[in-house]
């Protein structure tokens, strides 16, 4: 490396943190594609084994250095305040896809994090969700169970190609730091966030218990949405921003704001359904 540190040592010291979304097969393929790309990047540095090792390549390169260390965390984007126990289904699906994708460790977000500081009960459930995958489903006994699946293999290759092209375009523009300072990375992520919020609002993306099969009899009571308010992630403070920041609003935030406002007012809004055209054809 430029600092004179052997590439094998540097590669082994790097650990990646990923978020896990609710798209089951896509998430499995995402982690597989990430490992593939990282192995190719490390191989380009031709890392040398610094000790006697059986895991060497044809040219003597250290294959251990190409192993990607990944920690994953379930998403908060799709967590909801209302019908909060459905969050357990979301995080369990996400944890399962991450385990099948080959992550080394993971954090399962407690189901009540959206409206309170997680208590002992919700944290215990979050731990048990991982234990179920390990002790009941034996996910720790298999390596890359998705290998050979036509759908997942093709999805892996597709993600890897798209990610590599994006990586090259960022490098050609001056690198990630330049892109971060210019705000192009944040703009792309925020645009994706905006598109997903629109899809949820139009019910093109289903959020169970929010825009599909909501429980209208449920009352929020003392629940209040807990959202990060400043660029450093705090709730009640502001800080100066050297770069543009990301938008972390959850998918259900607009729906929840309407329901909380309605509940606080004590009056349900009325909607007039205007029928147009031939009723027999509807």
Q: Where does each model-flagged region fall?
A:
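Mobile "lid/hinge" segments at catalytic clefts and subdomain interfaces of large enzymes
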Residues: 1-3, 89-167
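Gly/Pro-rich turn-and-neighbor structural signature
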Residues: 1-78, 82-86, 168
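Conserved helix-loop functional segments at active or binding sites
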Residues: 2-6, 40-51, 94, 98, ...
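Glycine- and acidic
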Residues: 14-26, 74-78, 107-115, 141, ...
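Generic beta-strand/beta-sheet core signal
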Residues: 17-21, 71-75, 91, 108-111, ...
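Short glycine/threonine-rich loop-to-helix capping motif typified by GTGT followed
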Residues: 21-33, 74-88, 116-126, 151-166, ...
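Short, intrinsically disordered, charge-balanced linker/junction segments flanking boundaries
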Residues: 50-53, 223, 267-269, 274-282
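Intrinsic disorder at enzyme termini
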Residues: 104, 136, 140, 162-272
